[in-house]
Amino acid sequence: QQLDAGVDKDVWAATPQTVNAFYNPQANDITFPAAILQAPFYDKNADEAENLGAIGTIIGHEITHAFDTNGAGYDENGNYRNWWTEEDLAQFMARAQKVKDYYNGIEIENGLFQNGDQTVTENIADMGGMACVLEILGDDKQAQRKAFESNAKIWATNQIDQYRDYLLMVDVHSLNKVRVNAVLPLFDQFYDVYEITKNDAMYVAPEDRIQIW
């Protein structure tokens, strides 16, 4: 029915009962089905910082998809065309390569690594989502702590090794624990809140704390 009808930007990407969220570059919109607007992603009884660390980072994540290595190829009307200056595009791709390299270096266990090339768009979106939330929270360390810990809770996972290995092969997202343990150390606020030092396992040197947006 929709084959010759053109792009209908009012058609949803999922059913209301789907627990997920989406960015569609051809429509340049984000979709949040009703089912994701419940705990642990959104809780009406939680405070602002906790909700920002959960659903807030997801909202920021989906918006950032408009500016990842895929979404950046579409203009504001959903047309696939280059709208970047040559210099800006070169800078962006150089930073994206640093993201790939960073995640390629993450060892899950015993020589098993995250694939940074396969997951680059989602990793950029994860970083962008957290950056948005931290900008909103300002210098409030208590609020930052709540947001960090709320963010970690939404990615809590229990899975067998075989399923983990399958995800590493096919999923464009990093493993859930990587979405926490690799993202938070990229932000200076994480070090201030938890008093992280060079001796801690999650320490990343300041010059290696990649930021794109």
PLM regions and their residue ranges:
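Zinc-dependent metallohydrolase catalytic domains
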Residues: 1-54, 65-213
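P-loop NTPase nucleotide-binding module
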Residues: 58
